[in-house]
């Protein structure tokens, strides 16, 4: 698992180098995205998805009419949390040993980047789908 996460981390580092060749000048890093995949920040985003659905269930009699707002609100809340943590966090440069290791092995970074994005999107779809099913169940009661 650690090796898999290192591959995704390396892919994001290469992606970042391609789009930001002059280094970080403040702002966000693609490394944050892989941290969100592999750490507690994704758990926080999931918890806020559940809280958002409960708010809709509490304040609206027919929450299904507003289900399309749930992913949008979750994304906004998740971005605010991510913004807070990224500004608070001390940036770390990409691990040169990992980069050198994967350069030697010739691993295609784009494939791993695609897998990372796919896993992230799939997990968000699962959360959103679960919330919509929850709302539909409560709507029928």
For the regions a language model picked out, list residue spans one by one:
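Long protein-protein interaction modules used by eukaryotic assembly/scaffold proteins
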Residues: 73, 77-78, 90-99, 121-127
């Amino acid at each position: 698992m650690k090796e898999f996460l290192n591959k995704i981390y390396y892919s994001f580092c290469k992606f970042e180098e391609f789009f930001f060749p002059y280094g970080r000048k403040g702002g966000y890093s693609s490394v944050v995205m892989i941290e969100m995949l592999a750490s507690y920040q994704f758990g926080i985003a999931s918890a806020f998805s559940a809280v958002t659905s409960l708010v809709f269930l509490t304040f609206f009699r027919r929450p299904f009419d507003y289900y399309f707002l749930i992913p949008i609100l979750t994304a906004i809340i998740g971005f605010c949390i991510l913004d807070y943590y990224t500004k608070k966090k001390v940036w770390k440069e990409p691990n040169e040993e990992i980069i050198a290791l994967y350069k030697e092995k010739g691993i295609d970074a784009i494939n791993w980047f695609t897998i990372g994005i796919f896993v992230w999107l799939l997990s968000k779809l699962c959360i959103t789908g679960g919330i919509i099913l929850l709302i539909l169940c409560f709507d029928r009661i």
